[in-house]
Amino acid sequence: MDNEQYKIAHLNMVQNVINRMGNNCFLIKGWAITLLSALLTVLWEKGHLWIMFIPLILFWYLDSFYLRQERLYRNLYNKIIAGDQAVVKYSLCTKNCENNKTKLQAAAFSRSIAPFYVTIAALPLSYCLFSLLKYLLK
């Protein structure tokens, strides 16, 4: 195999990882909506909507983790295309691909994740605030 074929094979490997990470983000959002909707229906009558924050935070973390990983692999992909000599053939190591966009906090508050989870968190948060306000005004 010549160098160009190695590069194409390596890019295909990295592209497959990127696709899996994107698919994981999609699945996590689906599970988050399903589980949090079920919790909403069960906990609404009992008034314990604050419990919804536990799985919400866990799903938010998982989604952010996978987006971070996806960004790291996209950086690796770009380095392979650029012909970076620091990238070892067939290596999927992303240690040298860190930047400000690949930090977990940047992923958690990105445009594709934060609005989704903030919107979901708005319902139990508003319910808890109204309940507290109702309690304080008695």
Region spans (language model):
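Cytosolic-side membrane-entry/anchor segment at the start of a transmembrane helix
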Residues: 1-38
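Inner-leaflet juxtamembrane helices
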Residues: 17, 48-50, 54-100
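Alpha-helical transmembrane segments of integral membrane proteins
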Residues: 24-27, 31, 50, 54, ...
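Lipid-exposed faces of alpha-helical membrane segments in multi-pass integral membrane proteins
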Residues: 35, 51-58, 122, 126
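Hydrophobic alpha-helical transmembrane segments
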Residues: 37-45, 124-131
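Helix-coil boundary and interhelical linker segments in multi-pass alpha-helical membrane proteins
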Residues: 43-50, 137-138
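A hydrophobic membrane-anchoring alpha-helix module
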Residues: 88-138
